[in-house]
């Protein structure tokens, strides 16, 4: 039976009770306290307007590690032709709005509900959610957002309206994080696209071990608008 969350924002059921697809619990809210509690436990929300809030902890877990990260040669060639500029934390609301509203191939609707959008904007104001923006002059043409805790970054969503803009955002983010000794980027579930960059599948238990180390060995709360 799927567990229902209580009013205690810190409570989540044991991860071993998750279904085979990673679904762990439903209900609760998207308060900063509950979201941060979830991320530190290896849990994230993923649902749509037709369901209650659903909480997931997949096994295996897909992550990018600095030692395995690679840029495919075809993407390297594409990025060399780009004339875009990249910023960080300059347009978080615009990025998450684009991620929520732009249509995607083979996807109906969006999992970034209005409540989800407002929750991550609040996390951004608190210094935990961050965005990468890709610009063509003054036009936002791509980007991504996610959550940073300690030395772990949890990727949430990306978008592009110009070719290769989201690829540039991902490569820029990874290189930026590795330069600050981040331990990994959590990609949650594998996709053909992310596996091209050297993503690794690890067990839930190994992920939790890495996560515990990452969130206790450094701080990533933004001290300036530009920093993680």
From Swiss-Prot:
Keywords, A to Z, come to: Acyltransferase, Cytoplasm, Transferase
**Root EC class:** transferase
Q: What is its EC number?
A: 2.3.2.6
Q: Which reaction does it catalyse?
A: N-terminal L-lysyl-[protein] + L-leucyl-tRNA(Leu) = N-terminal L-leucyl-L-lysyl-[protein] + tRNA(Leu) + H(+); N-terminal L-arginyl-[protein] + L-leucyl-tRNA(Leu) = N-terminal L-leucyl-L-arginyl-[protein] + tRNA(Leu) + H(+); L-phenylalanyl-tRNA(Phe) + an N-terminal L-alpha-aminoacyl-[protein] = an N-terminal L-phenylalanyl-L-alpha-aminoacyl-[protein] + tRNA(Phe)
Compartments annotated for it: namely: Cytoplasm
| One annotated GO biological process | protein catabolic process
> For this protein, what is any one GO molecular function term?
leucyl-tRNA--protein transferase activity
Which Gene Ontology cellular component terms are annotated? cytoplasm
NCBIfam families per the UniProt record, alphabetical: aat
Listed HAMAP family = Leu_Phe_trans
**Could you say which protein family the record assigns here?**
Belongs to the L/F-transferase family.
Q: What is this protein called?
A: Leucyl/phenylalanyl-tRNA--protein transferase
Q: Which gene encodes it?
A: aat
